[in-house]
Structure formats: C-alpha cells, structure tokens
C-alpha cells in the first residue's frame, strides 16, 4: 500500500518518494 502525498493527496510511489517529518511527499511537491 502506497502512502498519500502530504501536499497534493495523491498516491506517492517508491520511485518518487521523499520522506520528511514522518510524512511522504512527491519530489515535486516537497
């Protein structure tokens, strides 16, 4: 199960995942 982006709310896939502050982000959203 993939997490949702903390900014846009869409699914974050492992290839574009940024983990910060215990949340997941897309590289573009971070």
UniProtKB/Swiss-Prot annotation:
The GO annotation for biological process reads:
monoatomic ion transport
Q: Tell me which InterPro entries the record gives.
A: LIM-SH3_domain_protein (IPR051759), Znf_LIM (IPR001781)
Please list the residue ranges annotated as the LIM zinc-binding domain.
5-30
Q: What is its main location?
A: cytoplasm
Keyword Translocase on entry? no
Going by the UniProt record, its keywords in alphabetical order are: Acetylation, Actin-binding, Cytoplasm, Cytoskeleton, Ion transport, LIM domain, Metal-binding, Phosphoprotein, Repeat, Transport, Zinc
Q: Which residues carry this modification: N-acetylmethionine?
A: 1
Please state where this protein is localized: Cytoplasm, Cell cortex; Cytoplasm, Cytoskeleton
The record's listing under Pfam families reads: LIM
**One GO CC annotation, please?**
cortical actin cytoskeleton
Q: Which Gene3D superfamilies match?
A: Cysteine Rich Protein
One Gene Ontology molecular-function label: actin binding
Describe how it is modified after translation.
Answer: Phosphorylated.
Describe its function. Plays an important role in the regulation of dynamic actin-based, cytoskeletal activities. Agonist-dependent changes in LASP1 phosphorylation may also serve to regulate actin-associated ion transport activities, not only in the parietal cell but also in certain other F-actin-rich secretory epithelial cell types.
Listed under subunit, the entry gives: Interacts with F-actin. Interacts with ANKRD54. Interacts with KBTBD10.
Protein name, UniProt field: LIM and SH3 domain protein 1
Upper lineage ranks? Eukaryota, Metazoa, Chordata, Craniata, Vertebrata
């Amino acid at each position: 199960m993939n997490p949702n982006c903390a900014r846009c709310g869409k699914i974050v896939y492992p290839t574009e995942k940024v983990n910060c502050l215990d949340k997941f982000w897309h590289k573009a959203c971070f």
